[in-house]
C-alpha cells in the first residue's frame, strides 16, 4: 500500500520516472520537482493525492506473460472506415473479434493502433482492397461517408430497357466498396452508421439507392433507426443506424432501452477542479494541471477570438441567420461535436464565469463526450484529436446496437 508521505511517494515514483516526465504529468516545472526533492518546499495536499495515485499505479504487479489459449470468439467482424474504433469497441464487448480493419487517415490509424494493438495490419484506402483479400466474417461494420449517387448512367439504362445493378448506381462512391465487400463475402449481418440527413440527402435519392442495393441486389432484410446520442451522453448527436441480416430475424430496434434524453449533463464529462480529477498517466499532463486543479490555460479563448465570435454571432443574429456559439454550463447538454471543432471550438464553449473567457473542451473531455472511457489513449496532437472525436460515434449507441444484434446471428 502506498505511503501517505508525499516525499516518500516522490522517491518511489522517481525510481521509474524522470523529473521531466513527472513534471509533465503533474503540470509543474522540473525546478518545482527539485525543490520538493531537496526539501525546500512541500508538495500541496492536491499534489500529494496525485502522487499517491501514481505510486499506486506503479505498485500494481505486472501480469506474467503466460501463453494463453485463445478463446474462440462468439463472432467475427470487420471494421471499415474505422476511424478511431468507436464501433469496434462496442462489438468487442459482445465477444466479437475484429479480423480486418480499413481506415485511410494515417493519424486516425495511429490512434486506432495505439488502442487496438492487433496482429493484423490496418488497411488504408478501401477502394484499393480486393474483396477476396478480406477475411470471411459474421458482421460487417462501416461508418461510411455520405455521398450523392449519379443517376445519369442509370437513367440511360432505363431508357434503353437494360437492367442495372448496384455497381452501376453506386460506382465512384465509398458505399460501392461497402456493397462489393458484402456481395463477395456474404456476411451474416452488417451495421452501417451515417449522419441523420442520409435519409433526405439528394432529395431522398441517396437513401433509395442504398436501400435498393442492400435489399434487392444483395438480399438482406434491413431495418434502420435515427438515434440521438443525448440518450446516453450530454450531446445532441443524431445518427442513422442501418442493420441488415441475411436471414430473416426478429431483430427490432425497439429492444434498445433508451434512457430519457438530456438526463446526462456536460458537468459529468468536464475535468474536475475540486481535486478529484483522476491522474491519467497516458495523458502525460497534456490537458489538465493537477497542481493548479484546472485545464491548461491554452484551452481558454484569447480576447481576440472571443470578441470575434461575439461580434460574428451578433452580426448573423441581426441578419436573421442562425449562427451562434454554443456556450455550455455544467448542467447543459451540448450541440453536436464536429470535426471542425479544432478551428475555434465555437459549437461547444465552456462557461468559466463573467470575469474569464470561455474555453474549449480538452481532447480528453471530447473523448468522454463521445462515450470513450478514460483508458482510451490519445497519441495525436489536439488538432488531430478534435477531428477524430468529431468524426467518431457515440460509443454507447453502438454498444446498445451490438447488444441486440449479437444474439440474432
Regions found by a protein language model. Give the residues of each.
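Core alpha/beta nucleotide-donor-binding catalytic domains of modification enzymes
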Residues: 61-186, 196-200, 205
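Residue-level detection of the helix-turn-helix DNA-binding "recognition helix"
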Residues: 27, 38-41
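DNA major-groove recognition helix of helix-turn-helix/homeodomain DNA-binding modules
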Residues: 43-62
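Short alpha-helical DNA-recognition segment
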Residues: 16-34
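Class I S-adenosyl-L-methionine
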Residues: 52, 92, 110-113, 129-139, 151-335, ...
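C-terminal target-recognition/interaction regions appended to catalytic cores
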Residues: 19-22, 44, 295-409
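A short, Lys/Arg-rich alpha-helix, primarily the initiator
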Residues: 1-15
